[in-house]
Amino acid sequence: MIYTEEQDRIIEYSDLDALYFFRLDRRLNMKGKARSHQKNYFKDFMTMDIETSVQGRDTDQPISITYSIATYIDGDCILCRTWEEYVDLIGQMSDTMNLSKYNRLVCYVHNLPYEFQFMRNYFHIDEVFATQARKVVKCYTKGVEYRCSYKLTNMGLERFTSSTPTCKHGKLSGEEYDYKKFRTPKTVLTPRELQYIYNDVAGLYEALIYKMNSDDHDVATVPLTSTGYVRRELRQAMAQNPANRRNFIKTRLDGYLYGLLRQARLILYPKKADFVNTF
């Protein structure tokens, strides 16, 4: 165990054992599950954030080194120092909690497109939903469904946590943390640096809990993006009049016209033709 400047506890990966995962599984099951589109979700969720250092910052080929992968779940902050440790952490959680395609744990990341570029080198990604090249909104692997909380809130983490009344762990100053300092997985982190890491995942968790409760949502019903709220309200409003559905069916595109529009779009925007292959 290690402790932050404010004495918040962080569990190091090396402190974990099989008993911890069984206890975590029991605690999460006691909180219940939610169902959506033939999938079961644990009602509680996890948050994750990574910290990296850049080697060769002033060269043509800088290299990013991950030295911290922190997660927060059910009041516990778990710190992995390498991706290999994180892969093993998720593997043990998946096995103990019987995670699968139809029994999922949600993990929110506040800049998922960035973390995704690292994750794809260590995990087999089974599902990806993106709005455009490198703009990942959601992905799935090993029973864990990762979602981008920035797309949900449309706010930076500092603004999101500071605007949440019940958030106790707001994001700390990036200038004070000194991103230019070179750190590796073997670097001994100071209590202040640990506080920065802790607040990022704990604060995000606290802010998301408040948002979901305020909006009367859970992980199964909350939209993926901030615009999802608007689309949902529109669908509900349109459903009030049965004639709207009939008019929609009457004016919808047929396969031939849809094909023509798709072809025209590819001609106008050739670089967006197959953006998924750029991951």
Predicted ranges, named:
Residues 47-49, 146, 279:
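Short hydrophobic beta-strand that contains or immediately precedes a catalytic carboxylate
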Residues 1-46, 50, 272:
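N-terminal accessory regions of nucleic-acid-interacting proteins
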Residues 49-53, 111-113, 117, 150, ...:
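Anionic group-transfer/hydrolysis microenvironments
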Residues 5-14, 56, 183-279:
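Common nucleic-acid-contacting/processivity interface regions adjacent to the catalytic cores
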Residues 75-189, 195-199:
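Conserved DEDDh/DEDDy metal-dependent 3′-5′ exonuclease domain
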Residues 25, 29-35, 41-46, 50-113, ...:
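Conserved non-catalytic scaffold segment of RNase H-like nuclease domains
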Residues 56-61, 111, 116-123, 207-208, ...:
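A short acidic (Asp/Glu
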